[in-house]
Regions:
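Hydrophobic targeting segments
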Residues: 29-33, 50, 59-61
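Short, charged/polar "capping" segments at the starts of alpha-helices
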Residues: 40-41, 66-73, 158-159
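Short internal beta-strands
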Residues: 58-67, 150
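GT-A fold catalytic core of metal-dependent nucleotide-sugar glycosyltransferases
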Residues: 105-163, 188-189
Length: 327
């Protein structure tokens, strides 16, 4: 589509001029995710794993109107009813129409974070399963000092045309070309009060996703929001070495992901079907099963994946509940 840069620049300038007010978030922390009907099995596995790993934080699960039934909501809360709350999104989390004509609900993530109850959140895609209890991430030194923590993505040659110096990405987001690694937003931490303007910009991008989601969906909007905000503060032509400088405006895990599991059908992105994200010392921390998502049946068993047995037991338990309750 043709994009009028002056129009979208004006929208961002107006956002900064108005300085959107932050809602009254409760002090504290929560884990936030979203689920819809087709991903019930995946969401149930995540809820079971958080309970099994000893998570003590509130868990907020969001959905759009009509995307979960009451029975499915009850199933999602059942692994830990005292901590898990399922909430309907109140705002207009729009679909983005991809170049293939399919609808993508990527803006749900942003609206879920915006509508979550607590000031500090750990977002998890419903298919990003922690390998150990992830609560310790809120004490990460970079997160504490910068109010955010992100993970890097895998890349392949077919994505290189997004990042050359004259690529539309930099023009649309009004960011100077730089060597910052692309984000993988299956998991992220944000202190909303500390990074309110940056997150407000992410939400602006979501609410105008027809312009901003052409570069991989919601994922790049987090990196671009933090970089754009920093450019406004220090000048659009200021330079940051995103691999070495302590001026990088966001917390960032130094290790990239790798893939395990059965081979993926595309033959790229590391070859496997499970993206393994690491912690600050390089240990495996998240199994992001974003290719072969869990279903009620026909799931592939990956012998090399930590906690794989537990995942399949959770799906078996879900099927038992569905059968017993005739859901």
């Amino acid at each position: 589509m043709q994009i009028d840069l002056s129009q979208i620049y004006s929208g961002v300038d107006q956002l900064y001029a108005n300085q959107p007010q932050m809602p009254s978030y409760a002090p504290g922390r929560s884990i936030v995710t979203s689920v819809y009907s087709a991903e019930l099995a995946t969401g149930y596995v995540l809820m079971c794993e958080l309970a099994r790993l000893g998570n003590k934080l509130p868990v907020e699960v969001f959905y759009r109107d009509g995307e979960l039934s009451q029975q499915q909501i009850d199933l999602l809360t059942s692994p830990d009813p005292s901590k898990i709350t399922v909430k309907k999104i109140r705002g207009n989390a729009k679909d983005f129409t991809t170049i293939y004509g399919t609808k993508a609900g990527w803006s749900v993530k942003v609206h879920a974070i915006y509508e979550s109850s607590y000031d500090e959140i750990l977002w998890l895609d419903s298919d990003s399963f922690p390998i150990t209890n992830p609560e310790f991430l809120f004490n990460d030194p970079e997160y504490v000092s910068k109010g955010s923590l992100f993970w890097r993505d895998v890349t392949s040659v077919d994505r290189s045309n997004r990042y050359y110096d004259q690529a539309p990405l930099w023009q649309v987001f009004r960011v100077q070309p730089n060597d910052g690694e692309p984000f993988e937003a299956g998991q992220l931490l944000i202190n909303k009060s500390k990074c309110w303007m940056q997150f407000s910009l992410v939400k602006h991008y979501a609410d105008n996703c027809e312009y901003y989601y052409h570069f991989g969906g919601d994922t790049e909007t987090f990196r671009m929001a933090w970089q754009h905000h920093e450019a406004r503060r220090n000048g659009y032509y200021s330079y940051i070495n995103y691999h070495a400088s302590n001026l990088v405006p966001y917390g960032f895990i130094p290790y990239g992901p790798f893939h395990k599991g059965v081979p993926n059908q595309y033959g790229k992105w590391g070859g496997g079907t499970v993206m393994v994200q690491r912690d600050r010392v390089g240990c495996e921390l998240f199994n992001h099963r974003n290719i072969n998502k869990f279903k009620l049946s026909g799931n592939v068993y990956n012998n090399d994946i930590t906690n794989e047995w537990h995942y399949h037991q959770h799906v078996k338990q879900l099927n038992t509940l569905l059968e017993v309750n005739k859901w």
